[in-house]
Regions:
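Non-catalytic terminal segments and appended small domains
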Residues: 1-65, 92-164
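Short coil-to-beta-strand transition motifs
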Residues: 18-22, 79-88
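Short glycine-rich loop/turn motifs that provide flexible caps or phosphate-binding loops at active sites
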Residues: 48, 69, 86
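Small beta-strand-rich domains/subdomains or short beta-sheet motifs embedded
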Residues: 55, 73-74, 79-83
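Gly/Ser/Thr-rich beta-alpha loop segments that engage phosphate groups in nucleotides
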Residues: 62, 72, 89
Length: 164
């Protein structure tokens, strides 16, 4: 699918070939008809602190958007990883369960978390120039993503959740 178009927003790198769930800081990348890869954006990682452990439900588990698909243990946060999509887990990233630091070091590459099939395969298509995902609750427009992310970083800095 080629190299993702990336931009730097407020000091964080954003990949614009994927869609973002603003409340949970999860991203969704089309991997083919009805198939997506899910991971955590760099701001979600930053606000969690140093990651100690990540665990996921097993492949074959049904996913419901808004419900947990795993758990994250970090310096500043212990809690659920919330699915941005409904469907079924096709694969989990075993490398991340062995080395949670992959999510910090390479959130858009080796640090992906799960691959899933979607309930409605017609909602997603992969295109040669990037991915188009049309799912409720996910930001899709690159300009909208950048504005949301910059505002969230400013808010978190104001609240002292991340460094200036």
């Amino acid at each position: 699918m080629g190299q993702a178009r990336r931009v730097t927003v407020a000091g964080f790198v954003l990949a614009l070939d994927r869609r973002y769930q603003p409340e949970t800081h999860m991203w969704v990348l089309a991997r083919g008809p009805g198939r997506v890869r899910v991971g955590m954006d760099p701001l979600g990682v930053e606000t969690s602190g140093t990651l100690a452990q990540v665990s996921f439900v097993p492949a074959g588990t049904e996913l419901t958007a808004g419900l947990p698909f795993g758990q994250l243990e970090a310096a500043k946060f212990v809690g659920p990883l919330v699915s941005p999509v409904s469907g079924a887990v096709l694969a989990v990233n075993g490398a991340v369960t062995r080395d949670a630091g992959l999510v910090e070091r390479d959130p858009y590459g080796a640090g992906w978390m799960i691959e899933a099939s979607l309930i409605e395969a017609s909602l997603i298509e992969a295109s040669p120039g990037g991915a188009t995902v049309e799912l409720p609750g996910l930001l899709a427009d690159p300009a909208e993503i950048s504005v949301w992310f910059a505002a969230k970083v400013a808010d978190y800095r104001l609240k002292g959740l991340i460094a200036q």
